[in-house]
Amino acid sequence: MLMIISPSKTQNFDPRPGIDYTVPAQAARTQRLVKQLRQYSPEDLGKLMKISPKLSDLNWQRYQDFQDSFTQNNAKQALLAFKGDVYNGIEVDTYTPEDFTFAQNHLRILSGLYGLLKPLDLIQPYRLEMGTKLQTDKGKTLYDFWGAQITDALNADLASDTTLVNLASGEYFKAVQPQQLNGKVLNIAFKENKNGTYKVIGIHAKRARGLMVNYAIQNRITAPKALQAFDEEGYGFEPSLSTETEWVFCRN
């Protein structure tokens, strides 16, 4: 069982020494994007990413400062650096070395800049959402740029894990080519009871994705069936709303 999640725009690069790290496998392609983004002015970067002048200046500087090599002086492990709704549900501050090892083997993070990340891959500060319409030599979007690269990387990991548990957003999962995967995809949805009807509420669903990742890591879950016991913060598996390819977890 391999889980995938989206990254986060919010990031924290305060040092966290003493934890193993790896280097992104697709770093060469990352540098191609960085080289291109360095050519943008802060104003053009703001238009491309639809962000404020303050964020435009911040991210322009990030790309100017981006280094060719990844070290603990200029980067941080992805699972530790990303913050935000999904990552608030992942209790990395309590993780043991064994927890990180399990995460490294069973979790992947999709990224517009880095492609496919392992939890302990070092990342430098950035902002580049997968849905950004960035023209490259591969096409008009980042989906064109990454092409089959992300799917190929997932297939390498799925050689021993036959189910891909999709806990990513639609924007990011679009970078995966499900028909080309060596395993089956299991989509997970989290819904809230609103006036007698179960609906997906974005902010709650994001946190729940993180909670499920955390649950799987801390309980060493390697078979999807065991995820049906997930009951964090009031959620429960709802068979009547679920199908073979999408499992729904509800909360009243």
UniProtKB/Swiss-Prot annotation:
Belongs to the UPF0246 family. InterPro entries: YaaA. One of its GO terms (biological process) is response to hydroperoxide. It comes from the Bacteria. It comes from Acaryochloris marina (strain MBIC 11017). This is UPF0246 protein AM1_4276. The lineage of its organism: Bacteria, Bacillati, Cyanobacteriota, Cyanophyceae, Acaryochloridales. One of its GO terms (cellular component) is cytosol. Pfam families: H2O2_YaaD.
